[in-house]
């Protein structure tokens, strides 16, 4: 139905010319507007997505969803997808028309459902190197803020990462489908599942970019982690720092050094865990590549 197809398996060799991303994604967009009314009628009570957690949550979206997003107020600076306010988004697609300037890089992102302008400010040498390594024709993951300017929509990127494993493309589009289904699910179905204690078995843990419980709570359902220095327990410790209300209320997020000091763990170890959790959609970069927040906004 959603037709997300990826040619080839791994590898990162692409030609920079000819064609567009439709040949890769196979028409992988979908039509969220068909069920929007159901989501917009969801308010209050259990289930659904409370207004207070909407705007800052990182949502995986397609370009078509961005272009179809409704504007939520008179100054036309806020957007909503399926009734949920959106400010921070994740997109996956092909970089086109890259233009390097002294302070920033602009390009067009094509994901097969449409095209959107993207701007990435280069605040330091790390940002410059990140963008220098990516060229026209590369497929990228973009995390950034959705903005409106002169009647047009664009993304101001916080991070741009070149894709080397094409499972990331499939994962992103499946994630988009799942988010769409969750946002448009009738309230009665949400409440019925809550009342009967029926778990939502369609959502794997790695695909949740919102409304997640801390991972330590999930792990305790099965068994408590037995090791104290590596593996799941260390990941939980790092994520729990980002789930701290004081950290979640900080718009800029926190850096690797902060987490390292708080947990008394090596910065290199913490940094690797954070990068892995960014790739899984649990964390995202904010003002630069050194500050991160949880995608759970609760």
Swiss-Prot record:
Keywords: DNA damage, DNA recombination, DNA repair, DNA replication, DNA-binding, Nucleus. It is found in: Nucleus. It comes from the Eukaryota. InterPro entries: NA-bd_OB-fold, NA-bd_OB_tRNA, RFA2-like, Rfa2/RPA32, RPA_C, WH-like_DNA-bd_sf, WH_DNA-bd_sf. One of its GO terms (molecular function) is single-stranded DNA binding. Residues 89-163 bind DNA. GO terms for biological process: DNA replication; double-strand break repair via homologous recombination; nucleotide-excision repair. Its main location: nucleus. This is Replication protein A 32 kDa subunit B. One of its GO terms (cellular component) is DNA replication factor A complex. Pfam families: RPA_C (PF08784), tRNA_anti-codon (PF01336). The keyword DNA damage applies. Belongs to the replication factor A protein 2 family. The keyword Cell membrane does not apply. It comes from Oryza sativa subsp. japonica. Phosphorylated in a cell-cycle-dependent manner (from the S phase until mitosis). In response to DNA damage, recruited to DNA-repair nuclear foci, as a hypophosphorylated form. Heterotrimer of RPA1, RPA2 and RPA3 (canonical replication protein A complex). Interacts with RPA1A and RPA3. Component of the replication protein A complex (RPA) required for DNA recombination, repair and replication. The activity of RPA is mediated by single-stranded DNA binding and protein interactions.
């Amino acid at each position: 139905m959603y037709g997300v197809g990826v040619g080839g398996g791994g590898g990162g060799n692409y030609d920079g010319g000819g064609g567009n991303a439709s040949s890769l994604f196979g028409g992988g967009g979908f039509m969220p507007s068909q069920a929007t009314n159901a989501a917009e009628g969801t308010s209050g009570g259990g289930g659904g997505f409370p207004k207070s957690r909407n705007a800052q949550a990182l949502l995986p979206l397609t370009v078509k969803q961005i272009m179809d997003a409704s504007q939520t107020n008179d100054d036309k600076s806020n957007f909503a997808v399926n009734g949920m306010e959106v400010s921070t988004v994740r997109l996956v697609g092909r970089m086109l028309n890259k233009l390097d300037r002294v302070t920033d890089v602009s390009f067009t992102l094509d994901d097969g459902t449409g095209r959107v302008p993207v701007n990435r400010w280069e605040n330091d040498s790390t940002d410059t190197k990140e963008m220098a390594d990516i060229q026209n024709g590369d497929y990228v993951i973009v995390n950034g803020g959705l903005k409106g300017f002169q009647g047009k929509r664009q993304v101001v990127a916080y991070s741009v990462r070149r894709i080397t494993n094409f499972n990331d493309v499939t994962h992103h589009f499946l994630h988009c489908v799942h988010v769409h289904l969750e946002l448009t699910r009738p309230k009665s179905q949400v409440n019925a599942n809550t009342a009967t204690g029926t778990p939502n078995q369609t959502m794997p843990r790695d695909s949740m970019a919102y409304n997640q419980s801390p991972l330590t709570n999930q792990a305790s359902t099965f068994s408590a982690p037995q090791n104290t220095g590596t593996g799941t327990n260390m990941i939980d410790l790092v994520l729990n720092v980002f789930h701290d209300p004081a950290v979640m209320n900080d718009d800029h997020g926190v850096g690797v050094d902060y987490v390292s000091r708080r947990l008394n763990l090596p910065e290199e170890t913490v940094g690797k865990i954070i990068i892995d959790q960014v790739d899984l959609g649990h964390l995202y970069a904010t003002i630069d590549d050194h500050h991160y927040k949880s995608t759970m906004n609760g």
